[in-house]
Every structure is written in C-alpha cells, then in structure tokens.
C-alpha cells in the first residue's frame, strides 16, 4: 500500500507497477479457482458481485428468456436484485426451502422451462448454515442450454468444498475469510455477457468502471490461498464451535431452526420461547 500506490489504469511508472501486481493477483486467483484470469472480476463486496451476476446477466441476455429461479431464503442483496428485475417485467420464481433449509436439485428441475435464463442460489445460508447441493443443481441447470447457474458462495468459501468448474457465476468476499473489507470478486465464465452496472471506464474488462482498489485486490490472492490451504483446519474448528453452541442452546427453552444435518457449523439459528 505504501510502495505501489499508483492507479493501475494510469500509464505512468507507478500505475504500471500497480497494474502488474493486480494482474498477477488475478492470475493466481484464477489458478486456485480453476479458471482463466479473464474470468475473475474484482468488486467491492459480495452484494455488488451478486447484483452484477443477477442483474447484469439478466439485462444483457433478456433475448434468451424472461424467467429467473431463486429461493425464498437468499441474502438480502439477491432478494433486492430479484425484486428489481421483477419490477421491470422479469418473472421471478422463488422456490420454498425444505425442512432441511435447502433447495433440492429436483425442485430446480421441476421449475426449469425453456424461458428460464438464470438460476441463482445461496450455497450456505448466512442465517441457518444450511448447505444447498450446488454441484447437483448445476448439473440439472446445464441440461437446459439457454440457462446458467449463479451460486452465492460468500459464506461457504474456504469452509466447504465448492465445485468451481461447474459454476457459471460465483460470488465470494474477502472479509468472510479474514481478508480486507472492500475486496470481493465475481467468477464469470468467459463466454457469458453481462450488462455493466457501473459506467465510466474500461476497468475489469469494461464490466466495472472506476479506479480499481489495487491494494486490497492484490492481497486477495494470498487471502484465498490461506483460506483454501487451511480449509480442513477451519472445518475442525467450526465443528467444535458448533457443538458448543448446540449444547449451550439446550440449556434454554429455545427452538432450533438450523438443520441438524447438511449444516455448516457454527451457524446456529434459534429463538428463545416464552
């Protein structure tokens, strides 16, 4: 931050140095996520990535269909994006979650039609910790040639296995894995076209105008590497915390809403009953 503080979009020496480091970070991240560097778009947060994936894809591909599938238990940024698309004429299908807190692959299969252009689901619930089988769902979505799949992996990244290669669009955020706030990304398959939501420059392949926050995005490569390398240790720590939380809640007249199975500890939703 102190040495390479230049604007990576500038032509002067400091700018070129920052740009080189930024692209090195992009390439390293792409290698870890099993994709090409041009499939990594840096953003400021998961909410922005979700909006870019959902609204950006829908607006750019409306000629492919008008139907979008999601669930009734998404992050608020996804819900807001869906509400906006609905207000301008898109058909949004909100699948109800099961008692285990997830959407099943068959739910998506039954809801898909020839007019469906996008399915967007959260991988791990930020409220209950329920884990939706996004790998199975991606396989179902890809049986429809005009439909793509977006997964919000903000809560799952670095904590559970993610089928990176199966996801057409994927959201993650640095601060959920002990990285810097203000740093996130959208993984986008290179053949997909998005409508930019921020105008004013050619940064991020023309997908996000404005000066790039080079220091935090450069640091993101190391943040991701440490998260993936330490995933098993993180899982063990979360399991221990989850047991502690679960045992503690049993001491109170509380009703538990988190599923016992297919849940990422220590997420534990409960409410004290009168």
Model-derived regions: residue spans:
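Pyridoxal 5′-phosphate
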Residues: 1-274
């Amino acid at each position: 931050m102190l040495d390479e503080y230049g604007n990576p979009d500038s032509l002067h020496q400091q700018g070129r140095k920052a740009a080189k480091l930024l692209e090195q970070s992009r390439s390293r991240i792409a290698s870890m996520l099993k994709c090409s560097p041009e499939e990594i778009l840096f953003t400021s947060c998961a909410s922005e990535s979700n909006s870019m994936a959902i609204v950006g894809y829908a607006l750019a591909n409306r000629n492919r269909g008008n139907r979008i599938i999601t669930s009734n238990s998404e992050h608020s940024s996804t819900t807001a994006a869906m509400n906006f698309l609905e207000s301008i004429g898109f058909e949004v299908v909100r699948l109800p979650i099961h008692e285990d807190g997830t959407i099943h692959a068959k739910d998506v299969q039954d809801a898909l039609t020839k007019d469906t252009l996008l399915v967007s689901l959260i991988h791990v619930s930020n409220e209950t910790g329920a884990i939706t089988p996004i790998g199975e769902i991606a396989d179902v979505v890809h049986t429809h040639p005009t439909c793509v799949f977006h997964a919000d992996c903000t809560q799952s990244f670095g904590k559970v296995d993610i089928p990176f290669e199966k996801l057409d669009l994927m959201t993650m955020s640095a601060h959920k894995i002990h990285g810097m706030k203000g740093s996130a990304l959208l993984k986008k398959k290179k053949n997909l076209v998005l409508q930019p939501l921020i105008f004013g420059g050619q940064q991020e392949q023309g997908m996000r105008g404005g000066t790039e926050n080079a220091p935090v995005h450069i640091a993101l490569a190391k943040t991701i590497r440490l998260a993936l390398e330490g995933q098993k240790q993180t899982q063990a720590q979360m399991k221990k915390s989850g047991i502690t939380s679960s045992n503690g809640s049993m001491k109170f007249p509380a009703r538990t809403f988190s599923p016992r199975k297919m849940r990422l500890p220590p997420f534990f939703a409960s409410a004290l009953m009168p």
